[in-house]
Amino acid sequence: DIDHVPGTNGKYDVVDGFPMGMVSLQDLKDYVSYSKLPFVAKGVLSVQDALKAKEAGCAAIVVSHHHGRLPFAIAPLQVLPLIKDALGDSDMKIFVDCGMDTGYDAYKALALGADGVSVGRGILSPLLKEGKDGVVKKMNKMNEELQEMMMYTGVKDVKHFDKTVLHYLPL
């Protein structure tokens, strides 16, 4: 996480003896250089952090407010278009999480510039109730909803979204 969320006591968590605090640009560059895999920074919620991740060499970012754990934080879909514009023609991928519970939510994120979405809490209930089959049903339903909205708005595939399919009010 680019912005590790502290515990509810206002202090940073300690994981394996390391305090989880804010991540500097140099920290991020080090993480990217140490990894043999494409590095993804999660918890990006500002243009400044997106540009920091780009400068550090991250392959992708996840625009996220940790599902509401950051009180008063901007919603990921509100800041997503600003981040997309700031990154310009960068080949860094942009993913979004937080509240991606339906295919309609995924549609909005893709229309606003995301390359993909992450689904977490949306699959927990089906997983607990029906196991793997519940997750498969949920994901199939989300895909159907996404395809439905794409059909209604003339979007031929997820690579060809036209951001005018949504009315976005800039901040």
Functional labels for PLM-detected ranges:
Residues 69, 98, 147-150:
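Generic anion/oxyanion-binding catalytic loop in active/binding sites
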Residues 88, 130-131:
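Glycine-centered helix-coil hinge/cap
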Residues 123, 131-171:
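C-terminal extensions of enzymes
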Residues 1-96, 103-125, 158-161, 169:
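Alpha/beta enzyme core
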